[in-house]
Amino acid sequence: MGNSSSKSSKKDSHSNSSSRNPRPQVSRTETSHSVKSAKSNKSSRSRRSLPSSSTTNTNSNVPDPSTPSKPNLEVNHQRHSSHTNRYHFPSSSHSHSNSQNELLTTPSSSSTKRPSTSRRSSYNTKAAADLPPSMIQMEPKSPILKTNNSSTHVSKHKSSYSSTYYENALTDDDNDDKDNDISHTKRFSRSSNSRPSSIRSGSVSRRKSDVTHEEPNNGSYSSNNQENYLVQALTRSNSHASSLHSRKSSFGSDGNTAYSTPLNSPGLSKLTDHSGEYFTSNSTSSLNHHSSRDIYPSKHISNDDDIENSSQLSNIHASMENVNDKNNNITDSKKDPNEEFNDIMQSSGNKNAPKKFKKPIDIDETIQKLLDAGYAAKRTKNVCLKNNEILQICIKAREIFLSQPSLLELSPPVKIVGDVHGQYGDLLRLFTKCGFPPSSNYLFLGDYVDRGKQSLETILLLFCYKIKYPENFFLLRGNHECANVTRVYGFYDECKRRCNIKIWKTFIDTFNTLPLAAIVAGKIFCVHGGLSPVLNSMDEIRHVVRPTDVPDFGLINDLLWSDPTDSPNEWEDNERGVSYCYNKVAINKFLNKFGFDLVCRAHMVVEDGYEFFNDRSLVTVFSAPNYCGEFDNWGAVMSVSEGLLCSFELLDPLDSAALKQVMKKGRQERKLANQQQQMMETSITNDNESQQ
């Protein structure tokens, strides 16, 4: 990172690539401007780039019209400056004719400025121009969610499934035994060079990190002999060989092609016996084995937990077995978590409900509380909201998610955000740069929690914006919005430490209702992970019944876990041990079949915050800069205009000290604005009294 020439080489490599799948004309304008950035010494490290190809002229190139042509885009990406790159995908139909593509590069001298008049309009215009962006009240924009009768019917159909659905939340007591805590060291390292370099990030550094997490108690569901919806647990091996073993993954049994998914995928095991244990000894140890190749594959930044020492792995498994032996002796008389959640929802609307649910939350006041907590730049022991307020937020968000389809169809303009991972300060920076809702429409691609230090504030603020602007603010599901992943990577521990286990269960129940994918303007397919070999129709996503957990294999699993690859194989098992990798052929087939121009996904750390793949037919967006405080990556947000002009707004990586300074400045602005508002209100009150 920090090597601008390497970056140019990477971007130029796409310019003269041959085309298997001709795409529409693409034009791009680039705006560069300088922004202060706090970069660590890591920025001097060089990065790997895509295979080099002949350099492209910066002037317009008109290729031979007799041959299919690709967008010829050159990006001069200098690491010391933040800039916006724009790519134009015409709103015309997906054409595969041999048309000419012209490169339009128009440098602009505009500098970084906070949007002024348009963002600063408000219901009450008094001193609106003096308010910081986080305090401005605006009229919501027109809804961008396209609705139709079929999606409404599906939503109604989904809500009726709650009586037969077993939520994937643990049934731990709030005072879990600390004896079940297991500490072990996980090694973060690079993978072998077997993966193609074009999809690995160059800002790779080997690091060691002590990760302490609590292993789950074996809870049990209450048995119901009249229902047959429990799934038999999948027995898995703890050996490394299990990651190489695969089973057929099929959305339907009539498919012509069978693909395989490794057994150690992150699905949830449920038993048909009366104990109904959520995590069995096998499934728990399998989860631990799976964590060795979890969220971000070693082909990019290997920040996932490669346990290289076999004896260390054996010790972990032995400890897991001891924990499970203890847990097997615990009898849990709790009722089904779904019934518990339904009881909460019923009590919230009942006249005889407890006092704590009688007073509905003020969503505007709640948002301001969360913003104040963020700008305070202090991680407090407790959340700024009460537990009953958190429950109400989850209940309201859950209802909205279920009222909207699993496959969102959105109209531009919209800003698309990748992984956030509990980096609350960076989320506030993102909103400051791109506009606080509702000044901009947003689509988040998932992974809101885990790894970061303020996952609760992050997900609560996003839920609050969803509640306030349900037709302009959208959240997709990521692979971290799942019970067993959050149990290992931090969100469970944070909920238990700062709230209680019931709060965590309620979040999991809400995660189970999140939509899975979105289509922008009928041309951009947005998803957290990627494609699936069993996806034959968009209706298969539309008709997914929610709430649902993340299964071991199949469509939902693939949408949340799959990754692109340069492999010659169209589909192959993923090195994560979960789902698949898909190559350029699979991407081109997908685009041709459904008439899309671009796949926009997240799920991977990329050094520049965004990274194109397969001649710009797929883009990875990652929005957590300085990820985990260990990697010097940038964060990015992809903005899609009404004319399908795609631009990228970048967040430079800040260390904790620099981030605190940014939050301090925001806190001072908010404090000053509050004082001015109070003075104005006092003045108005005095004037009214004097007139009377």
UniProtKB/Swiss-Prot annotation:
Family, as annotated: Belongs to the PPP phosphatase family. PP-Z subfamily.
Coiled-coil ranges per UniProt: none
Residues the record lists as Phosphothreonine modifications: 171, 261
In-chain residues carrying the UniProt-annotated modification Phosphoserine: 49, 209, 222, 265, 690
Catalytic activity, EC: 3.1.3.16
Bias type Acidic residues, positions: 170-179
Lipidation (N-myristoyl glycine): 2
Disulfide topology: none
Major enzyme class: hydrolase
Gene Ontology molecular-function annotations: metal ion binding; protein serine/threonine phosphatase activity
Listed cofactors: Mn(2+)
Organism: Saccharomyces cerevisiae (strain ATCC 204508 / S288c) (Baker's yeast)
Catalytic activity: O-phospho-L-seryl-[protein] + H2O = L-seryl-[protein] + phosphate; O-phospho-L-threonyl-[protein] + H2O = L-threonyl-[protein] + phosphate
Family matches, as Gene3D superfamilies: 3.60.21.10
The name this protein goes by in its record: Serine/threonine-protein phosphatase PP-Z1
Binding-site list for Mn(2+) 2: 447, 479, 528, 603
Assembly information from the UniProt record: Interacts with SIS2 and VHS3, which regulate its activity.
Miscellaneous field: Present with 217 molecules/cell in log phase SD medium.
Bias type Basic and acidic residues, positions: 207-216, 291-303
Function (record text): Essential for the maintenance of cell size and integrity in response to osmotic stress.
Entry note: cofactor: Binds 2 manganese ions per subunit.
